[in-house]
Amino acid sequence: MSTHQTHLKQLEAESIQIMREVAAEFDNPVMLYSVGKDSSVLLHLARKAFYPGKIPFPLMHVDTNWKFKEMIEFRDQMAEKHGFDLIVHKNPRGLEMNISPFTHGSAKHTDIMKTEGLKQALDAHGFDAAFGGARRDEEKSRAKERVYSFRDNKHRWDPKNQRPELWNIYNGKVDKGESIRVFPLSNWTELDIWQYIYLEGIEIPSLYLATERPVVERDGTLIMVDDERMPLEADEDVQNKMVRFRTLGCYPLTGAVESQAQTLPEIIQEMLLCTTSERQGRVIDNDSAGSMEKKKIEGYF
């Protein structure tokens, strides 16, 4: 076995141990399933952790109504194929207000449809622990977050008051209304994720693979025209370009990257040469300085 396979096996074992710990320790856990590559790895690990039994907690997708069409199709296919319990939540207040990233802006859209929607769903079902696919290498505020991330009864995160984590010992004590966000992939990198997907044969949305797609360049970001709701500016033209996505979210807020990588080995090769963050295409990360940390303090993923 190669050195890197051993490294991946160590990461796999750590993540599985965290999942089993949460399943044993908490009364009502849930896995946040956002349909991307990290969620796909989380799902695969959960199936391994509890095999041959069924995953002992539901998966939940907070749907903003603006996800890529392929993401929704892939989500439903995975739920049918693997038979897991799937909860889909859309913020009814946001739907009633017809919140849109085009008319209301990325910050308000994210706050109402993602953050508020997530908090609504967690409260409605009384979940005391929620798995997420965040990794420390993604973004600076996530780099300092614990594996067990304590949230108060308003789902707020206090980065200055985090619990110590010694080795693999985690403190899951919560009072009524409080909860823990759990990040089993904290120590994985983007390259680890792609190599694991390749070695384990994990299914992912084809949006991650390069092909010709209709895109518009807006403020330096390539936005894919995924449906008829996208308004075009007077000076904008839709062009077919060879692009793929390094991260997935709401299509108006997720930039594509020009790429020729059409297979997993080609993506891995691209990762070895890449010098930019995968979240460079996330419009919401550029709302203001420290915007991700502010969102997490308010209850974001």
From Swiss-Prot:
Keywords: ATP-binding, Nucleotide-binding, Nucleotidyltransferase, Transferase. It catalyses: sulfate + ATP + H(+) = adenosine 5'-phosphosulfate + diphosphate. Heterodimer composed of CysD, the smaller subunit, and CysN. It comes from Shewanella woodyi (strain ATCC 51908 / MS32). Its EC number is 2.7.7.4. One of its GO terms (molecular function) is sulfate adenylyltransferase (ATP) activity. Belongs to the PAPS reductase family. CysD subfamily. InterPro entries: PAPS_reduct_dom, Rossmann-like_a/b/a_fold, SO4_adenylTrfase_ssu, Sulfate_adenylyltrnsfr_sub2. NCBIfam families: CysD, PRK05253.1, PRK12563.1. It holds the Pfam family PAPS_reduct. Pathway: Sulfur metabolism; hydrogen sulfide biosynthesis; sulfite from sulfate: step 1/3. GO terms for biological process: hydrogen sulfide biosynthetic process; sulfate assimilation. With CysN forms the ATP sulfurylase (ATPS) that catalyzes the adenylation of sulfate producing adenosine 5'-phosphosulfate (APS) and diphosphate, the first enzymatic step in sulfur assimilation pathway. APS synthesis involves the formation of a high-energy phosphoric-sulfuric acid anhydride bond driven by GTP hydrolysis by CysN coupled to ATP hydrolysis by CysD. This is Sulfate adenylyltransferase subunit 2. The gene is cysD.
